[in-house]
């Protein structure tokens, strides 16, 4: 009977040891699982925080870029009386090199002579406006004559570019109101007159611009003189250093 009791106690001890071992194994497995989950959570948190940091930096950079864009002072370069067979292509070369878009107010009689230059203007993203057909003072013409000056030029430009011009600069800045014909165009004058047609002097043209220009100004030049082509190169560099951005007149008017 005593041996039987001893065997029972030994068996109970082994059973207890087995149970303890199983419990330890389960606890160890659970700990590893918790540790793995904790590490995965920490890794996810680090990745999430890093992604958020990158997104925040990108958002900040975008906002700073937008603020810089808003801070730029906009001005418009405009050229009258073209296209000229020699100097307008040179002017287009300068603008292309500088990455600047300008506005050209064209004479119909010049458009007829040099359609390939007008086509190039349009293809390179410049704005084309109407400057009448023969540069006559519209207010001194009859309504029919004034309408002819405008409409004939519109049709010529359309035949080359496929678009009717929306902007009109009347010669001498003198517009004839209440025309009998329908001329539904936006009149564009200027703020800074370089008088380049008078001086034909590069330095005087540059001085006229840099000493008078302000934000939102429209600058008047003529793409018919070598001195103007030379001046524009420096005018662009000088004004860009002062924080100016060159746009076409529609961008100024629409804002």
Question: At which residue positions do the language-model features occur?
Answer:
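Generic detector of well-ordered alpha-helical packing
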Residues: 19, 81-82, 132, 197, ...
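Terminal accessory/targeting
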Residues: 1-69, 73-75, 93-102, 215-255
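Active-site beta->alpha N-cap acidic-glycine motif
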Residues: 42-141, 145-146, 152, 156, ...
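Catalytic domains of cell-wall/extracellular-matrix polysaccharide-remodeling enzymes
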Residues: 136-245, 250-255
């Amino acid at each position: 009977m005593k041996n039987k009791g001893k065997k029972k106690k030994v068996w109970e001890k082994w059973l207890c040891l087995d149970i303890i071992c199983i419990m330890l194994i389960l606890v160890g497995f659970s700990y590893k699982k918790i540790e793995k989950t904790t590490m995965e959570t920490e890794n996810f948190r680090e990745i999430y925080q890093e992604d958020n940091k990158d997104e925040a930096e990108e958002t900040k950079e975008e906002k700073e870029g937008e603020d810089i864009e808003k801070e730029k002072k906009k001005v418009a370069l405009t050229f009258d009386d073209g296209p000229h067979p020699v100097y307008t292509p040179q002017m287009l070369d300068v603008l292309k090199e500088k990455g600047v878009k300008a506005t050209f107010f064209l004479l119909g009689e010049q458009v007829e002579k040099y359609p390939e230059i007008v086509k190039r203007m349009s293809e390179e993203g410049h704005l084309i406006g109407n400057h009448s057909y023969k540069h006559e003072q519209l207010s001194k013409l009859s309504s029919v004559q004034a309408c002819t000056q405008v409409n004939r030029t519109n049709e010529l430009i359309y035949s080359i570019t496929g678009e009717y011009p929306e902007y009109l600069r009347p010669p001498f800045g003198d517009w004839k109101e209440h025309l009998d014909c329908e001329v539904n165009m936006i009149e564009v004058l200027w703020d800074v007159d370089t008088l380049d047609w008078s001086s034909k002097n590069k330095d005087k043209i540059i001085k006229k611009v840099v000493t008078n220009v302000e934000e939102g100004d429209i600058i008047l030049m003529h793409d018919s003189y070598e001195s103007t082509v030379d001046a524009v190169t420096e005018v662009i560099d000088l004004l860009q250093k002062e924080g100016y951005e060159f746009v076409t007149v529609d961008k100024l008017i629409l804002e």
